[in-house]
């Protein structure tokens, strides 16, 4: 009976550690995805701003209304 309790306690302990490690890995992966998404948003904003400025320059040059 005592060895059964020790075995169950050991399995519970190992399962708890395993669950904790899985959660840490999942959190780290979510952080990487968030960083990638933030980088993509920054790139999109940079491209949009550049295109907008270029379009504004072209319109200003063609019409002379600046």
Swiss-Prot record:
Keywords: Amphibian defense peptide, Antibiotic, Antimicrobial, Cleavage on pair of basic residues, Disulfide bond, Fungicide, Secreted, Signal. Disulfide bonds join 60-66. The keyword DNA-binding does not apply. It comes from the Eukaryota. One of its GO terms (biological process) is killing of cells of another organism. Residues 23-43 form a propeptide. Coiled coil: none annotated. One of its GO terms (cellular component) is extracellular region. It holds the Pfam family Antimicrobial22. Has antimicrobial activity against Gram-negative bacterium E.coli ATCC 8739 (MIC=25 ug), against Gram positive bacteria S.aureus ATCC 6538 (MIC=3.1 ug), methicillin-resistant S.aureus ATCC 43300 (MIC=12.5 ug), B.subtilis ATCC 6633 (MIC=12.5 ug) and against fungus C.albicans ATCC 90028 (MIC=50 ug). Belongs to the frog skin active peptide (FSAP) family. Brevinin subfamily. This is Nigrocin-2ISa.
């Amino acid at each position: 009976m005592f060895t059964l309790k020790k075995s169950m306690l050991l399995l519970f302990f190992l399962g708890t550690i395993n669950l904790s490690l899985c959660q840490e890995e999942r959190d780290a992966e979510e952080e990487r995805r968030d960083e990638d998404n933030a980088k993509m948003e920054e790139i999109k904003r940079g491209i949009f701003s550049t295109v907008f400025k270029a379009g504004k320059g072209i319109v200003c040059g063609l019409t002379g209304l600046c």
